[in-house]
Amino acid sequence: MGNGMCSRKQKRIFQTLLLLTVVFGFLYGAMLYLELQTQLRKAEAVALKYQQHQDSLSAQLQVVYEHRSRLEKSLQKERLEHKKAKEDFLVYKLEAQETLNKGRQDSNSRYSALNVQHQMLKSQHEELRKQHSDLEEEHRKQGEDFSRAFNDHKQRYLQLQQEKEQELSKLKETVYNLREENRQLRKAHQDIHTQLQDVKTQVAEYKQLKDTLNRIPSFRNPDPAEQQNVTFTHGTHPPQGYNVREKLTGELQEGQQNHDAMPRRMEEKPLSSMQKEAGFQALEEQNQVEPREPEGRQVEEEHRKALEEEEMEQVGQAEHLEEEHDPSPEEQDREWRDQRRQNAAHLLDGRPQAEIEHSTKAATNFRSPYEEQLEQQRLAARRDEEAQRLREHQEALHQQRLHGQLLRQQQQQQYLAREMAQQKQADHEEGQQQYQLRQQAHSDAVENDVAQGAEDQGIPEEEGGAYDRDNQRQDEAEGDPGNRQEFHEPGHQEGDPEAEADRAAAQDINPADDPNNQGEDEFEEAEQVREENLPEESEERKQSEAKQGNVEMDEHLVMAGNPDQQEDNVDEQYQEEGEEEVQEDLTEEKKRELEHNAEETYGENPDDKNNDVEEQGVPNRAHPKGRQEHYEEEEDEEDGAAVAEKSHRRAEM
């Protein structure tokens, strides 16, 4: 039994372990599957990205291949033309052997002059660089001064803003203190108003009593002494310019004391009927005088309101004081009236006790609790309204301050954006000016080369052309279009004496000047053929100039389109110079061989040579300019081939 139980337990344990391993294996497989799915999605995204990149590269490569095919076609065409020009040039070399040495000497002298001019232009270029560095330093100093001034103004602005905020907080404190004082004065005015209502009830009772006493005939004729007392009481006037705010509490206490002492005096001193009548007469005269007295106080009230309005406007919160009833002058009048009435009441101490008790009871029970509650609610509503007005004013001031700050920030941002736009526009204009200068210098160089080639007819300027190309490439490597323009202008000016020398050399090899030729008819026929061939030569010259201009414009566009290509100009120039030197050496060797062969043939058969010259006189005279044009086209083709090779190499890069 024990073994069976153990085996069952072990079996259950094994089953649970197996189940757990299966579950964990399933979970691990699910996690591995999810991880592989995520990696697969990432790999698909990367593959899609690389596929798009490959498509873009293939499109770019297709464009490059198309450009390469066009360049190869143009190169093949130029090679054919170059081959044809070389054949013509070899024929031309035999005839131009004598003029070659002279052309070399002229080209050497020209090269020395151009070299001197090049050194001068280099010195000018260094001076311009120094001036540029000085201007950059001055610009940097001005920028530092501007930043310093801007920081100073910013600090000053922040300081002024802090000072204004402090002043504003102080003004708010003063406004709060003035409001507290106004609230206290309103409270005091409310107390005095309640006392005034009590006194009004007493005055009404006094009038009733006076009417009853006037009906009695014994009280209608007072004694002269009593009239003097009445006039004496009538002669007491209220004090003018009495300050309520300073003596308000003292008057209230005095009024309380007089009001409390009035019943006691009535009980202690019974007055005669004449004194009562005199008191009532004094009250009547007081009521007649009292309407005149507020006129003087009204002026003081208006003056005081104007002063308070000015104080409120300085704080930034001008309030309409007409809406807020300020009762300080009225309180003054009422206090004075109460005092007069109390003085008159002292004369009426002899009236019956029942009337006095009735009047005091009416005075004490005049204001009901409902009226007091309404008055308290009115005061609370007024205080809430004032607090709400103060909060609204503070919120308006805060919003105004925030609006001002936002406006200042917007103005500052607009100023900075305007400065950035002006700077960008200036940079853009400067770049356009530089590009126009480079383009103008390039076009001037092309025109000068074309004019110089047209003037130098009959001179194979192989070495001189190589020197000019070297100098031109050096100027382009230096990247100074102004120097390149000045470099070609003296060359154009110096072309006139060289052209005259070339014409003299061409006239030397003219068959008309040859002593062996004696046929004048042949010379006339040659002149006629030359005149007929002039239009054809002009057309060919125009075509060659247009072709040369197109090649140079393509080169300029390629150089301007890719700024990285401009950095490789110097290395390519050195390579091209080396290749040209090798080609020049080969051509010089061929020239020597041809000269040697020509001398041998001339020494063996001089008559045949003369005959050949006579036979070739007409075509030589007819095509001297054509050969020169072929020579110039050969140079242009060499330049175009070099440019095509450069562009092809850059396209491959």
From Swiss-Prot:
Its main location: Golgi. Phosphorylated by c-AMP-dependent kinases most probably in its lumenal part. Residues 34-653 are lumenal. Residues 123-143, 261-270, 290-307, 319-328, 348-360, 381-398, 466-505, 527-545, 588-599 have a biased composition (Basic and acidic residues). GO terms for cellular component: endosome membrane; Golgi apparatus; Golgi cisterna membrane; Golgi membrane; membrane. Expressed in liver, pancreas and pituitary (at protein level). Keywords: Coiled coil, Endosome, Glycoprotein, Golgi apparatus, Lipoprotein, Membrane, Myristate, Phosphoprotein, Signal-anchor, Transmembrane, Transmembrane helix, Transport. The modification Phosphoserine is found at residues 328, 538. Residues 66-216 form a coiled coil. It comes from Rattus norvegicus (Rat). Residues 565-587, 631-640 have a biased composition (Acidic residues). It comes from the Eukaryota. This is Golgi integral membrane protein 4. The modification Phosphotyrosine is found at residues 574, 631.
